[in-house]
A protein has these predicted regions:
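N-terminal amphipathic/hydrophobic targeting modules at extreme N-termini
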Residues: 4-5, 9, 19
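Hydrophobic h-region of N-terminal signal peptides that target proteins for export
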Residues: 37-45
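Mature N-terminal, pre-catalytic/accessory segment of carbohydrate-active enzymes
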Residues: 44-84
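Substrate-binding cleft and catalytic face of glycoside hydrolase catalytic domains
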Residues: 95-269
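Noncatalytic carbohydrate-binding groove/subsite architecture in carbohydrate-active enzymes
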Residues: 200-345, 352
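Aromatic/acidic polysaccharide-binding cleft in carbohydrate-active enzymes
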Residues: 303-406, 417-429
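Carbohydrate-binding surface patches
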Residues: 424-461, 468-471, 500-504
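C-terminal beta-strand-rich structural cap/linker in extracellular carbohydrate-active enzymes
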Residues: 483-509
Length: 509
Protein backbone atom coordinates (compact mmCIF):
# COMPACT_ATOMS: atom_id res chain seq x y z
CA UNK A 1 0.00 0.00 0.00
CA UNK A 2 1.25 3.48 -0.86
CA UNK A 3 0.61 6.39 1.44
CA UNK A 4 0.09 9.86 0.03
CA UNK A 5 -0.76 13.11 1.74
CA UNK A 6 -2.83 15.34 -0.51
CA UNK A 7 -3.34 19.06 -0.35
CA UNK A 8 -5.46 18.81 2.75
CA UNK A 9 -3.93 15.54 3.98
CA UNK A 10 -1.23 17.34 5.98
CA UNK A 11 -3.88 19.09 8.08
CA UNK A 12 -5.74 15.83 8.59
CA UNK A 13 -2.49 14.15 9.60
CA UNK A 14 -1.82 16.79 12.27
CA UNK A 15 -5.32 16.58 13.71
CA UNK A 16 -5.13 12.82 14.04
CA UNK A 17 -1.71 12.84 15.69
CA UNK A 18 -2.75 15.58 18.12
CA UNK A 19 -5.81 13.56 19.09
CA UNK A 20 -3.78 10.40 19.58
CA UNK A 21 -1.13 12.11 21.72
CA UNK A 22 -3.84 13.41 24.03
CA UNK A 23 -5.72 10.09 24.14
CA UNK A 24 -3.02 7.52 24.80
CA UNK A 25 -0.57 7.04 27.62
CA UNK A 26 3.02 7.41 26.63
CA UNK A 27 4.19 3.82 26.46
CA UNK A 28 5.89 1.84 23.76
CA UNK A 29 2.85 -0.13 22.60
CA UNK A 30 0.80 2.98 22.20
CA UNK A 31 3.57 4.61 20.24
CA UNK A 32 3.49 1.65 17.86
CA UNK A 33 -0.28 2.02 17.50
CA UNK A 34 0.28 5.70 16.90
CA UNK A 35 2.50 4.99 13.91
CA UNK A 36 0.04 2.46 12.48
CA UNK A 37 -2.95 4.75 12.86
CA UNK A 38 -1.16 7.70 11.33
CA UNK A 39 -0.15 5.58 8.34
CA UNK A 40 -3.70 4.32 7.92
CA UNK A 41 -5.07 7.83 8.20
CA UNK A 42 -2.70 9.09 5.54
CA UNK A 43 -3.40 6.14 3.29
CA UNK A 44 -7.15 6.51 3.55
CA UNK A 45 -7.14 10.23 2.97
CA UNK A 46 -5.03 9.83 -0.16
CA UNK A 47 -5.20 12.67 -2.59
CA UNK A 48 -7.80 15.35 -2.24
CA UNK A 49 -11.02 14.01 -3.74
CA UNK A 50 -12.94 16.62 -5.70
CA UNK A 51 -16.70 16.48 -5.54
CA UNK A 52 -18.20 17.12 -8.96
CA UNK A 53 -21.88 17.22 -9.85
CA UNK A 54 -23.33 17.16 -13.34
CA UNK A 55 -26.45 19.25 -12.82
CA UNK A 56 -29.66 19.41 -14.84
CA UNK A 57 -29.05 23.08 -15.58
CA UNK A 58 -28.66 23.59 -19.33
CA UNK A 59 -25.77 25.81 -20.43
CA UNK A 60 -26.92 25.71 -24.04
CA UNK A 61 -29.59 23.64 -25.72
CA UNK A 62 -29.46 21.72 -28.98
CA UNK A 63 -25.71 21.93 -29.50
CA UNK A 64 -24.78 21.74 -33.19
CA UNK A 65 -21.88 19.44 -32.48
CA UNK A 66 -18.15 18.95 -32.76
CA UNK A 67 -16.99 18.29 -36.29
CA UNK A 68 -14.14 18.56 -38.76
CA UNK A 69 -13.05 20.27 -41.94
CA UNK A 70 -13.26 17.60 -44.64
CA UNK A 71 -12.58 18.97 -48.10
CA UNK A 72 -12.99 16.73 -51.16
CA UNK A 73 -9.35 16.00 -52.08
CA UNK A 74 -9.84 18.24 -55.10
CA UNK A 75 -6.13 19.11 -55.24
CA UNK A 76 -5.01 15.46 -55.39
CA UNK A 77 -5.50 15.01 -59.17
CA UNK A 78 -2.95 17.77 -59.81
CA UNK A 79 -0.48 15.73 -57.71
CA UNK A 80 -1.11 12.63 -59.81
CA UNK A 81 -2.92 10.86 -56.96
CA UNK A 82 -6.44 9.92 -56.00
CA UNK A 83 -8.19 8.33 -53.05
CA UNK A 84 -8.68 4.63 -53.77
CA UNK A 85 -11.88 2.75 -52.98
CA UNK A 86 -10.06 0.99 -50.14
CA UNK A 87 -8.94 4.33 -48.72
CA UNK A 88 -12.47 5.69 -48.94
CA UNK A 89 -13.71 2.72 -46.93
CA UNK A 90 -11.04 3.40 -44.31
CA UNK A 91 -12.13 7.03 -44.16
CA UNK A 92 -15.78 6.09 -43.83
CA UNK A 93 -15.03 3.64 -41.01
CA UNK A 94 -13.16 6.30 -39.06
CA UNK A 95 -15.65 9.10 -39.65
CA UNK A 96 -18.51 6.73 -38.79
CA UNK A 97 -16.99 6.37 -35.33
CA UNK A 98 -16.36 10.11 -35.14
CA UNK A 99 -20.04 10.89 -35.86
CA UNK A 100 -19.32 14.57 -36.50
CA UNK A 101 -22.05 17.02 -35.66
CA UNK A 102 -21.28 18.77 -38.92
CA UNK A 103 -18.71 18.87 -41.70
CA UNK A 104 -17.22 22.00 -43.19
CA UNK A 105 -16.43 21.23 -46.83
CA UNK A 106 -14.70 23.91 -48.90
CA UNK A 107 -13.76 23.66 -52.57
CA UNK A 108 -11.65 25.43 -55.15
CA UNK A 109 -13.69 25.97 -58.29
CA UNK A 110 -10.53 25.84 -60.40
CA UNK A 111 -10.09 22.22 -59.33
CA UNK A 112 -13.70 21.30 -60.08
CA UNK A 113 -16.20 23.13 -62.26
CA UNK A 114 -13.97 25.79 -63.88
CA UNK A 115 -11.25 25.16 -66.44
CA UNK A 116 -9.77 28.07 -68.42
CA UNK A 117 -13.04 29.88 -68.85
CA UNK A 118 -15.20 26.80 -69.29
CA UNK A 119 -17.90 25.77 -66.81
CA UNK A 120 -18.32 22.00 -66.41
CA UNK A 121 -20.26 20.71 -63.42
CA UNK A 122 -19.10 17.12 -63.90
CA UNK A 123 -15.38 17.93 -64.01
CA UNK A 124 -13.40 16.15 -61.25
CA UNK A 125 -16.60 15.83 -59.23
CA UNK A 126 -16.28 12.17 -58.19
CA UNK A 127 -14.58 12.72 -54.82
CA UNK A 128 -16.92 15.54 -53.81
CA UNK A 129 -19.96 13.47 -54.73
CA UNK A 130 -18.65 10.49 -52.77
CA UNK A 131 -18.02 12.64 -49.69
CA UNK A 132 -21.46 14.27 -49.90
CA UNK A 133 -23.13 10.88 -50.44
CA UNK A 134 -21.58 9.70 -47.19
CA UNK A 135 -22.85 12.78 -45.34
CA UNK A 136 -26.31 12.50 -46.90
CA UNK A 137 -26.64 8.83 -45.95
CA UNK A 138 -25.56 9.51 -42.34
CA UNK A 139 -27.58 12.68 -41.89
CA UNK A 140 -24.47 14.80 -41.31
CA UNK A 141 -25.03 18.51 -41.90
CA UNK A 142 -22.58 20.16 -44.29
CA UNK A 143 -21.38 23.75 -44.36
CA UNK A 144 -20.24 24.02 -47.97
CA UNK A 145 -18.39 26.84 -49.64
CA UNK A 146 -15.67 28.19 -51.89
CA UNK A 147 -12.28 29.35 -50.69
CA UNK A 148 -12.07 31.99 -53.42
CA UNK A 149 -13.26 32.41 -57.01
CA UNK A 150 -11.54 30.01 -59.43
CA UNK A 151 -9.62 32.96 -60.86
CA UNK A 152 -8.91 36.15 -58.95
CA UNK A 153 -10.02 38.20 -61.93
CA UNK A 154 -13.53 36.83 -61.39
CA UNK A 155 -13.88 38.09 -57.82
CA UNK A 156 -16.54 40.69 -58.69
CA UNK A 157 -17.76 39.08 -61.91
CA UNK A 158 -21.38 38.02 -62.30
CA UNK A 159 -20.08 35.04 -64.28
CA UNK A 160 -18.56 33.56 -61.12
CA UNK A 161 -21.66 34.27 -59.05
CA UNK A 162 -23.80 32.45 -61.60
CA UNK A 163 -21.39 29.51 -61.96
CA UNK A 164 -20.95 29.11 -58.22
CA UNK A 165 -24.67 29.18 -57.44
CA UNK A 166 -25.48 26.94 -60.40
CA UNK A 167 -22.99 24.41 -59.06
CA UNK A 168 -24.53 24.67 -55.58
CA UNK A 169 -28.01 24.15 -57.02
CA UNK A 170 -26.78 21.15 -59.00
CA UNK A 171 -25.39 19.57 -55.84
CA UNK A 172 -28.40 20.30 -53.64
CA UNK A 173 -31.42 20.04 -55.92
CA UNK A 174 -30.33 17.91 -58.85
CA UNK A 175 -28.02 15.51 -57.02
CA UNK A 176 -30.19 15.61 -53.90
CA UNK A 177 -27.54 16.57 -51.35
CA UNK A 178 -29.75 18.57 -49.06
CA UNK A 179 -27.30 17.72 -46.29
CA UNK A 180 -25.75 21.01 -47.48
CA UNK A 181 -27.46 23.53 -45.23
CA UNK A 182 -25.18 26.57 -45.34
CA UNK A 183 -23.05 28.22 -48.03
CA UNK A 184 -19.84 30.26 -47.58
CA UNK A 185 -18.92 32.51 -50.50
CA UNK A 186 -15.37 33.45 -49.38
CA UNK A 187 -12.98 31.88 -46.90
CA UNK A 188 -11.66 34.39 -44.34
CA UNK A 189 -12.61 37.53 -46.28
CA UNK A 190 -10.90 39.71 -43.66
CA UNK A 191 -7.49 38.27 -44.55
CA UNK A 192 -4.93 39.99 -46.75
CA UNK A 193 -4.47 36.55 -48.35
CA UNK A 194 -8.14 36.35 -49.40
CA UNK A 195 -9.71 37.77 -52.53
CA UNK A 196 -11.79 40.43 -50.70
CA UNK A 197 -8.56 41.62 -48.99
CA UNK A 198 -10.42 42.72 -45.88
CA UNK A 199 -12.89 44.96 -47.69
CA UNK A 200 -16.12 44.54 -45.72
CA UNK A 201 -18.14 46.67 -48.14
CA UNK A 202 -17.12 44.50 -51.09
CA UNK A 203 -17.85 41.30 -49.18
CA UNK A 204 -21.26 42.64 -48.13
CA UNK A 205 -22.15 43.46 -51.73
CA UNK A 206 -21.11 39.98 -52.84
CA UNK A 207 -23.25 38.37 -50.13
CA UNK A 208 -26.23 40.31 -51.47
CA UNK A 209 -25.47 39.31 -55.04
CA UNK A 210 -25.07 35.64 -54.15
CA UNK A 211 -28.32 35.70 -52.20
CA UNK A 212 -30.14 37.27 -55.13
CA UNK A 213 -28.74 34.63 -57.48
CA UNK A 214 -29.78 31.84 -55.11
CA UNK A 215 -33.30 33.27 -55.16
CA UNK A 216 -33.38 32.75 -58.94
CA UNK A 217 -33.17 28.98 -58.38
CA UNK A 218 -36.62 27.93 -57.12
CA UNK A 219 -36.45 26.11 -53.80
CA UNK A 220 -32.74 26.64 -53.17
CA UNK A 221 -33.10 29.24 -50.43
CA UNK A 222 -35.56 26.97 -48.65
CA UNK A 223 -32.77 24.42 -48.25
CA UNK A 224 -29.57 26.47 -48.02
CA UNK A 225 -28.74 29.71 -46.21
CA UNK A 226 -25.63 31.84 -46.35
CA UNK A 227 -23.05 31.52 -43.57
CA UNK A 228 -20.60 34.22 -42.55
CA UNK A 229 -18.60 36.25 -42.04
CA UNK A 230 -16.01 33.43 -41.68
CA UNK A 231 -13.40 35.79 -40.21
CA UNK A 232 -10.41 35.06 -37.98
CA UNK A 233 -10.31 35.83 -34.25
CA UNK A 234 -7.32 37.96 -33.18
CA UNK A 235 -6.50 38.99 -36.73
CA UNK A 236 -6.87 42.58 -37.89
CA UNK A 237 -6.16 43.48 -41.49
CA UNK A 238 -4.88 47.08 -41.58
CA UNK A 239 -6.96 47.56 -44.71
CA UNK A 240 -10.14 46.47 -42.95
CA UNK A 241 -12.49 48.73 -41.03
CA UNK A 242 -13.21 46.02 -38.45
CA UNK A 243 -11.64 43.35 -36.30
CA UNK A 244 -13.36 39.96 -36.02
CA UNK A 245 -15.99 41.01 -33.43
CA UNK A 246 -16.62 44.09 -35.56
CA UNK A 247 -17.14 42.00 -38.70
CA UNK A 248 -19.67 39.84 -36.85
CA UNK A 249 -21.49 42.84 -35.40
CA UNK A 250 -21.64 44.64 -38.74
CA UNK A 251 -22.80 41.49 -40.50
CA UNK A 252 -25.59 41.18 -37.96
CA UNK A 253 -26.55 44.81 -38.50
CA UNK A 254 -26.47 44.70 -42.31
CA UNK A 255 -27.17 41.13 -43.40
CA UNK A 256 -28.94 39.23 -40.64
CA UNK A 257 -31.94 38.49 -42.84
CA UNK A 258 -29.59 36.78 -45.33
CA UNK A 259 -27.37 34.92 -42.85
CA UNK A 260 -28.58 31.62 -41.46
CA UNK A 261 -25.43 30.78 -39.52
CA UNK A 262 -22.67 32.96 -38.10
CA UNK A 263 -19.20 31.49 -38.24
CA UNK A 264 -15.71 32.56 -37.25
CA UNK A 265 -12.27 30.93 -37.19
CA UNK A 266 -10.05 30.50 -34.14
CA UNK A 267 -6.40 29.50 -33.83
CA UNK A 268 -5.56 30.24 -30.20
CA UNK A 269 -2.35 29.37 -28.39
CA UNK A 270 -1.91 26.65 -25.81
CA UNK A 271 -1.27 29.04 -22.93
CA UNK A 272 -4.16 31.22 -24.01
CA UNK A 273 -6.61 28.31 -23.84
CA UNK A 274 -5.26 26.59 -20.76
CA UNK A 275 -5.19 29.87 -18.82
CA UNK A 276 -8.85 30.57 -19.61
CA UNK A 277 -8.12 33.72 -21.62
CA UNK A 278 -9.57 32.27 -24.82
CA UNK A 279 -12.84 31.34 -23.12
CA UNK A 280 -13.16 34.97 -22.04
CA UNK A 281 -12.47 36.12 -25.60
CA UNK A 282 -15.39 34.11 -26.98
CA UNK A 283 -17.70 36.29 -24.91
CA UNK A 284 -16.84 39.30 -27.09
CA UNK A 285 -18.99 38.03 -29.97
CA UNK A 286 -22.64 39.02 -30.12
CA UNK A 287 -25.15 37.65 -32.59
CA UNK A 288 -28.88 38.26 -33.00
CA UNK A 289 -31.31 36.28 -30.89
CA UNK A 290 -32.39 33.07 -32.54
CA UNK A 291 -29.18 32.66 -34.56
CA UNK A 292 -26.18 30.44 -33.82
CA UNK A 293 -22.42 30.99 -33.91
CA UNK A 294 -19.87 28.26 -34.68
CA UNK A 295 -16.12 28.04 -35.05
CA UNK A 296 -15.99 26.97 -38.69
CA UNK A 297 -12.26 26.34 -38.35
CA UNK A 298 -10.37 25.69 -35.14
CA UNK A 299 -6.86 24.61 -34.23
CA UNK A 300 -3.76 25.85 -32.44
CA UNK A 301 -0.99 28.22 -33.51
CA UNK A 302 2.00 29.13 -31.39
CA UNK A 303 3.01 32.64 -32.49
CA UNK A 304 2.27 34.15 -29.07
CA UNK A 305 5.17 34.80 -26.72
CA UNK A 306 3.96 32.33 -24.08
CA UNK A 307 4.16 29.51 -26.63
CA UNK A 308 7.64 30.36 -27.94
CA UNK A 309 9.07 26.94 -27.12
CA UNK A 310 6.25 25.20 -28.98
CA UNK A 311 6.74 27.49 -31.97
CA UNK A 312 10.45 26.75 -32.04
CA UNK A 313 9.77 23.02 -32.04
CA UNK A 314 7.14 23.43 -34.74
CA UNK A 315 9.63 25.31 -36.92
CA UNK A 316 12.37 22.74 -36.29
CA UNK A 317 10.14 19.88 -37.39
CA UNK A 318 8.89 21.74 -40.44
CA UNK A 319 12.44 22.41 -41.58
CA UNK A 320 13.34 18.73 -41.21
CA UNK A 321 10.15 17.31 -42.73
CA UNK A 322 10.19 15.65 -46.18
CA UNK A 323 6.43 16.27 -46.47
CA UNK A 324 6.16 20.03 -46.13
CA UNK A 325 8.08 23.25 -46.48
CA UNK A 326 6.29 24.47 -43.40
CA UNK A 327 3.69 26.56 -45.20
CA UNK A 328 0.78 26.80 -42.79
CA UNK A 329 1.44 23.51 -41.00
CA UNK A 330 0.86 22.43 -37.42
CA UNK A 331 3.77 20.03 -36.98
CA UNK A 332 2.77 19.14 -33.41
CA UNK A 333 -0.73 17.96 -34.33
CA UNK A 334 0.54 14.38 -34.10
CA UNK A 335 1.74 14.82 -30.52
CA UNK A 336 -0.30 13.36 -27.69
CA UNK A 337 -0.81 16.71 -25.95
CA UNK A 338 -2.48 18.17 -29.04
CA UNK A 339 -5.39 15.80 -28.46
CA UNK A 340 -5.75 17.12 -24.93
CA UNK A 341 -5.69 20.69 -26.19
CA UNK A 342 -8.39 20.02 -28.79
CA UNK A 343 -10.58 18.59 -26.04
CA UNK A 344 -10.03 21.63 -23.81
CA UNK A 345 -10.89 23.91 -26.72
CA UNK A 346 -14.14 22.03 -27.31
CA UNK A 347 -15.03 22.32 -23.63
CA UNK A 348 -14.51 26.08 -23.72
CA UNK A 349 -16.73 26.30 -26.80
CA UNK A 350 -19.50 24.16 -25.33
CA UNK A 351 -19.47 25.80 -21.91
CA UNK A 352 -19.17 29.25 -23.48
CA UNK A 353 -22.38 29.04 -25.48
CA UNK A 354 -20.80 28.77 -28.93
CA UNK A 355 -22.89 26.28 -30.88
CA UNK A 356 -20.16 24.08 -32.38
CA UNK A 357 -16.70 23.83 -33.86
CA UNK A 358 -14.96 22.09 -36.73
CA UNK A 359 -11.34 21.11 -36.24
CA UNK A 360 -9.01 22.10 -39.04
CA UNK A 361 -8.63 19.48 -40.49
CA UNK A 362 -9.42 15.79 -41.02
CA UNK A 363 -6.57 14.76 -43.32
CA UNK A 364 -3.06 15.92 -44.23
CA UNK A 365 -3.85 15.03 -47.85
CA UNK A 366 -6.41 17.79 -48.33
CA UNK A 367 -4.22 20.78 -49.19
CA UNK A 368 -0.74 21.89 -50.16
CA UNK A 369 0.98 25.23 -50.37
CA UNK A 370 1.24 25.63 -54.13
CA UNK A 371 0.77 22.69 -56.48
CA UNK A 372 3.28 20.26 -54.99
CA UNK A 373 2.41 17.49 -52.51
CA UNK A 374 5.89 18.03 -51.09
CA UNK A 375 4.50 21.11 -49.38
CA UNK A 376 1.45 19.71 -47.61
CA UNK A 377 -0.51 21.66 -45.05
CA UNK A 378 -0.06 19.26 -42.17
CA UNK A 379 -2.96 19.63 -39.75
CA UNK A 380 -4.81 16.34 -40.06
CA UNK A 381 -5.48 13.18 -38.10
CA UNK A 382 -3.65 11.11 -40.78
CA UNK A 383 -2.53 11.25 -44.42
CA UNK A 384 -4.75 8.88 -46.36
CA UNK A 385 -2.47 9.27 -49.41
CA UNK A 386 0.69 8.45 -47.49
CA UNK A 387 1.47 5.39 -49.58
CA UNK A 388 0.43 6.97 -52.89
CA UNK A 389 2.38 10.20 -52.41
CA UNK A 390 5.34 9.13 -50.31
CA UNK A 391 5.44 5.33 -50.38
CA UNK A 392 4.80 5.29 -46.62
CA UNK A 393 1.69 3.42 -45.50
CA UNK A 394 2.36 4.30 -41.86
CA UNK A 395 1.36 7.91 -42.59
CA UNK A 396 -2.20 6.66 -43.12
CA UNK A 397 -2.54 5.50 -39.50
CA UNK A 398 -4.47 7.74 -37.07
CA UNK A 399 -2.44 10.16 -34.99
CA UNK A 400 -3.08 10.22 -31.22
CA UNK A 401 -5.25 13.34 -31.42
CA UNK A 402 -7.85 11.46 -33.47
CA UNK A 403 -8.53 9.30 -30.41
CA UNK A 404 -9.54 12.20 -28.19
CA UNK A 405 -11.39 14.10 -30.90
CA UNK A 406 -13.37 11.00 -31.87
CA UNK A 407 -14.60 10.80 -28.27
CA UNK A 408 -15.40 14.51 -28.02
CA UNK A 409 -17.27 14.42 -31.32
CA UNK A 410 -19.16 11.16 -30.89
CA UNK A 411 -20.25 11.65 -27.30
CA UNK A 412 -21.18 15.33 -27.48
CA UNK A 413 -23.52 14.74 -30.41
CA UNK A 414 -25.58 17.11 -32.47
CA UNK A 415 -28.77 18.06 -30.65
CA UNK A 416 -27.48 17.41 -27.15
CA UNK A 417 -27.93 19.87 -24.30
CA UNK A 418 -24.71 21.06 -22.68
CA UNK A 419 -25.09 20.78 -18.91
CA UNK A 420 -23.53 22.81 -16.14
CA UNK A 421 -20.86 21.01 -14.14
CA UNK A 422 -20.68 22.12 -10.51
CA UNK A 423 -17.08 21.70 -9.33
CA UNK A 424 -14.57 23.63 -7.24
CA UNK A 425 -12.13 25.68 -9.34
CA UNK A 426 -8.97 23.62 -9.66
CA UNK A 427 -6.02 24.64 -11.78
CA UNK A 428 -5.26 22.16 -14.54
CA UNK A 429 -8.75 20.69 -14.89
CA UNK A 430 -11.42 21.33 -17.52
CA UNK A 431 -14.80 19.59 -17.66
CA UNK A 432 -17.93 19.38 -19.78
CA UNK A 433 -21.15 17.39 -19.73
CA UNK A 434 -24.09 16.77 -22.04
CA UNK A 435 -27.47 15.05 -22.17
CA UNK A 436 -29.48 13.67 -25.08
CA UNK A 437 -32.64 11.58 -24.81
CA UNK A 438 -31.99 10.95 -21.12
CA UNK A 439 -28.44 9.72 -21.63
CA UNK A 440 -25.39 11.61 -20.44
CA UNK A 441 -21.71 12.24 -21.08
CA UNK A 442 -19.14 13.67 -18.69
CA UNK A 443 -15.58 14.43 -19.80
CA UNK A 444 -12.65 15.82 -17.85
CA UNK A 445 -9.17 16.82 -18.99
CA UNK A 446 -6.36 16.93 -16.45
CA UNK A 447 -3.51 18.97 -17.91
CA UNK A 448 -1.69 19.25 -14.59
CA UNK A 449 1.31 17.18 -13.52
CA UNK A 450 -0.58 15.30 -10.78
CA UNK A 451 -3.30 12.67 -10.90
CA UNK A 452 -6.71 13.87 -9.70
CA UNK A 453 -9.42 11.87 -7.96
CA UNK A 454 -13.01 12.91 -8.63
CA UNK A 455 -16.21 11.92 -6.90
CA UNK A 456 -18.52 12.55 -9.85
CA UNK A 457 -22.29 12.65 -9.49
CA UNK A 458 -23.86 11.70 -12.81
CA UNK A 459 -26.61 9.11 -13.36
CA UNK A 460 -25.56 6.38 -15.78
CA UNK A 461 -27.07 3.11 -16.93
CA UNK A 462 -24.96 0.64 -18.86
CA UNK A 463 -22.26 3.26 -19.26
CA UNK A 464 -18.66 3.02 -20.42
CA UNK A 465 -15.43 4.79 -19.57
CA UNK A 466 -12.77 5.85 -22.06
CA UNK A 467 -9.30 7.09 -21.20
CA UNK A 468 -6.93 9.07 -23.36
CA UNK A 469 -3.61 8.54 -21.58
CA UNK A 470 -0.29 8.47 -23.37
CA UNK A 471 0.83 4.91 -24.01
CA UNK A 472 -2.49 3.48 -22.81
CA UNK A 473 -5.20 4.17 -25.39
CA UNK A 474 -6.81 0.83 -26.27
CA UNK A 475 -8.10 0.43 -29.83
CA UNK A 476 -9.79 -2.18 -31.97
CA UNK A 477 -8.45 -3.65 -35.21
CA UNK A 478 -9.41 -0.48 -37.10
CA UNK A 479 -7.54 1.77 -34.69
CA UNK A 480 -10.77 3.08 -33.14
CA UNK A 481 -11.15 3.82 -29.40
CA UNK A 482 -12.22 1.02 -27.07
CA UNK A 483 -13.56 1.68 -23.56
CA UNK A 484 -11.49 0.64 -20.56
CA UNK A 485 -14.61 -0.19 -18.54
CA UNK A 486 -18.19 -1.16 -19.41
CA UNK A 487 -21.48 -1.80 -17.61
CA UNK A 488 -21.17 1.31 -15.46
CA UNK A 489 -24.31 2.23 -13.54
CA UNK A 490 -25.39 4.28 -10.57
CA UNK A 491 -25.36 7.93 -9.62
CA UNK A 492 -21.87 8.45 -8.18
CA UNK A 493 -18.56 7.43 -9.64
CA UNK A 494 -15.01 7.61 -8.35
CA UNK A 495 -12.69 8.62 -11.17
CA UNK A 496 -8.93 8.77 -11.18
CA UNK A 497 -7.94 11.20 -13.91
CA UNK A 498 -4.25 10.72 -14.72
CA UNK A 499 -1.97 13.69 -15.15
CA UNK A 500 -1.99 14.83 -18.78
CA UNK A 501 -5.03 12.70 -19.53
CA UNK A 502 -8.66 12.72 -20.61
CA UNK A 503 -11.36 10.57 -19.03
CA UNK A 504 -14.85 10.32 -20.52
CA UNK A 505 -17.89 8.63 -18.96
CA UNK A 506 -21.01 8.08 -21.03
CA UNK A 507 -24.08 5.94 -21.48
CA UNK A 508 -24.77 7.36 -24.94
CA UNK A 509 -24.61 4.84 -27.79
Amino acid sequence: MGFMIGKYGVTLHRRITDHIFYSFSDNRMNRIWLVVLVMLACGCSGQERLRVCVSDEVVQSSYLGNGVEWDPYDEAPSWGAEVSDADWETLFTRVDFLRPGFIRCMVGGQNLYYDRGTFDRERNAASLLKLLSFCQDRGIEVIYGEFNPPDRSLKADDAWVKMSVDYLDWLVQEKGFDCIRHFIIFNEPDGDWATPEGDYGFWKSMMERFHAEMARHPGLLEKVTLAGPDVVIEYRNPASAYDAPGWVAQTAADLDSLVGLYDIHAYPGQHQVRSGAFADMLGEFRIPEGKRLVLGEAGYKYWREEDAALQAENDRRAEASPYTLGTDSQMLCGDFFYGLDLSILAMDVMNGGVAGLAVWMLDDALHAGGSSPRNLKIWGFWNILGEELFGDKSLEAPKPSFYSWALMSRYFPRGCDILKVDAPPVEGLRMAAACLDGRRTFAVVNFSESDRILDAAIPLSGGVRYEYVEGACPTDADGLPVPVATGIGGNRHKLTVPAQGLVLLTDMP
